[in-house]
């Protein structure tokens, strides 16, 4: 057979086996199915076609065994080709964007130049207006300076001379003598007003100087009063001794002089009240004048109240001599007035004047007026005034005043922290340390709470537990149960846990257990060793609580520490006969 004949027979297509045919059909179905599933058209996205045919390539390579290496190399070239196309496409997109940017640069430059011209024109307008305004300001200043230097001439000026002169009839205005007389009257009135301006009005600085001078004089008065009391006491003692000596000399001098003095002194004590009454009823001109001044002061105060000048009346009452109007009765007078539309509350004006002048008197404002003043200020939403009163003025605080401030803080949540700070000051001044510490806890000032507790010697464990019930904070409990400055903890951790779980505060107790659980067994052991208040039975209860609430590891740690501590026996130094190895030989 020739070569030509062999080539003729080789032209026939190869016979495909059944398995290959089924494989080709499955591949064809896979391509059609995936194309329809992805919604690819004939001109669809190349990435999705690439994924489909890459998977087909993988299936063909897995199916064919004879040409696997050739097909693998073809697939690699195919992947490299597709990757090159993608890279070129990204490069084209980036270059296209840069080209657009370069093409838009001339237009942007034109817009920027145009905007620069507009802004420069606006700046020129603003500078021009500023220079005009500055020139006007300089002109006004110059005119004001000239006006201040010149003497002001007061002269009557009538825009319409045809109108009648006020206070004169038409016939009198035409009479020269009447006009001369009226002009003399106006000149006298002008001189009187000018003199009144010099006498009745003083600069504000003069008032400040007088206030300082008044404070100095009040201090001198207090010193003089104290000295006067001491001298009166010395005079009374000398008078008793003098009377006793004269009586003892007149007597037979049989009894000792010291016993005689004591007997006369007792007689003086029994007759003391009568002496005081006689002293008050003594006809002293100075005291009569003082009573007259006080009576006039009260009448003037009532007159101001009737005229509706409540601000002046408040200042008048606050500066009353011997504090005769600084009392509850005066407060009730202002309270009865009530609110006036468009004007400040008269009662608030009274308390402002009362508290501001508290430093001018030797005794502070009493507790009742302090409480009413704080209530009045808070009812008018004037927390700023109350803050100034509490921190700056001389007041007498009470527990009720602190409670009122705390209640206001609960209503006004925005100013709650400020109210708690003010209440803490009030409670501290009153010696109510428990409430003061509670205010600090509510503010979150844990370190100040610890310092406060350390300063108090009579703060017991029950007080601490009550504090935790009022303000259950994890940070506070941790500070109370830790050593501070090498001192024992203020509170037992075990007792705190038991108290929290018994008082339906399970959430706080669980948070506390979570924090302790983070420290591991070393932290638990240190906590238990330093806790000298909690017994073994109590710690066993704590372990049971841990186990019931899902803290099994913490429960096991506590139990193991308890067992290890139970196995330890302390040997005293005096017991020298103890044989430590005795159990080995027995």
UniProtKB/Swiss-Prot annotation:
Annotated keywords: Coiled coil
InterPro entries documented for this protein: ARM-type_fold (IPR016024), Clathrin_H-chain_linker (IPR012331), CLHC1 (IPR017212), TSNAXIP1_N (IPR032755)
Gene3D superfamilies recorded: 1.25.40.30
Pfam family, one: Clathrin_H_link
Coiled coil: 174-232
PANTHER family to which the protein is assigned, alphabetical: CLATHRIN HEAVY CHAIN LINKER DOMAIN-CONTAINING PROTEIN 1 (PTHR10292:SF11), CLATHRIN HEAVY CHAIN RELATED (PTHR10292)
The protein, known as: Clathrin heavy chain linker domain-containing protein 1
């Amino acid at each position: 057979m020739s070569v030509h004949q062999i080539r003729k027979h080789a032209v026939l297509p190869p016979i495909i086996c059944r398995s290959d045919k089924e494989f080709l059909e499955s591949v064809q179905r896979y391509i059609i199915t995936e194309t329809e599933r992805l919604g690819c058209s004939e001109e669809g996205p190349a990435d999705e076609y690439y994924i489909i045919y890459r998977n087909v390539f993988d299936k063909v390579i897995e199916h064919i065994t004879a040409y696997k290496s050739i097909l693998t190399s073809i697939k690699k070239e195919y992947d490299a080709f597709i990757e090159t196309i993608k890279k070129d496409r990204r490069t084209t997109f980036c270059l296209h964007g840069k080209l657009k940017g370069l093409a838009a640069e001339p237009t942007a430059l034109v817009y920027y130049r145009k905007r620069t011209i507009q802004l420069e024109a606006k700046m020129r307008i603003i500078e021009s207006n500023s220079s005009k305004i500055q020139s006007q300001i300089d002109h006004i200043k110059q005119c004001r300076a000239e006006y201040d230097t010149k003497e002001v001439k007061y002269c009557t000026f009538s825009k319409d001379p045809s109108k009648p002169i006020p206070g004169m009839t038409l016939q009198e205005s035409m009479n020269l003598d009447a006009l001369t007389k009226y002009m003399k009257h106006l000149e006298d009135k002008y001189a009187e007003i000018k003199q009144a301006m010099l006498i009745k009005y003083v600069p504000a600085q003069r008032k400040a100087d007088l206030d300082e001078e008044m404070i100095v004089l009040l201090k001198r008065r207090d010193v003089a009063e104290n000295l006067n009391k001491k001298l009166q006491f010395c005079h009374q003692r000398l008078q008793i001794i003098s009377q006793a000596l004269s009586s003892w000399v007149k007597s037979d001098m049989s009894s000792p002089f010291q016993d005689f003095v004591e007997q006369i002194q007792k007689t003086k004590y029994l007759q003391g009240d009568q002496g005081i009454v006689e002293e008050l009823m003594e006809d002293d001109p100075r005291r009569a004048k003082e009573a007259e001044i006080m009576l006039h002061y009260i009448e003037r105060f009532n007159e101001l109240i009737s005229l509706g000048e409540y601000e002046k009346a408040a200042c008048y009452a606050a500066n009353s001599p011997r504090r005769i109007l600084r009392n509850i009765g005066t407060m009730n007078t202002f309270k009865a007035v009530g609110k006036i539309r468009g004007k400040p509350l008269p009662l608030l004006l009274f308390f402002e004047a009362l508290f501001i002048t508290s430093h001018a008197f030797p005794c502070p404002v009493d507790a009742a007026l302090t409480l009413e003043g704080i209530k009045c200020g808070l009812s008018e939403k004037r927390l700023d005034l109350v803050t100034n009163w509490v921190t700056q003025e001389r007041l007498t605080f009470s527990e009720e005043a602190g409670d009122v401030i705390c209640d206001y803080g609960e209503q006004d949540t925005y100013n709650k922290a400020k109210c708690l700070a003010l209440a803490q000051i009030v409670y501290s001044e009153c010696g109510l340390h428990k409430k003061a510490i509670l205010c600090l806890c509510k503010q979150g000032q844990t370190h100040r709470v610890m310092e406060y507790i350390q300063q108090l010697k009579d703060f017991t464990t029950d007080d601490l537990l009550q504090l935790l019930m009022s303000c259950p904070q994890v940070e506070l409990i941790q500070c109370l149960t830790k050593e501070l400055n090498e001192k024992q903890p203020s509170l037992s951790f075990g007792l705190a846990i038991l108290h929290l779980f018994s008082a339906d505060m399970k959430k706080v107790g669980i948070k506390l257990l979570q924090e302790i659980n983070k420290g591991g067994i070393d932290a638990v052991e240190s906590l238990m060793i330093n806790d000298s208040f909690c017994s073994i039975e109590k710690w066993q209860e704590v372990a049971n609580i841990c186990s019931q609430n899902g803290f099994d590891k913490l429960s096991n740690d506590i139990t193991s520490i308890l067992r290890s501590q139970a196995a330890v026996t302390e040997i005293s130094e005096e017991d020298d006969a103890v044989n430590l190895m005795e159990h080995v030989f027995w």
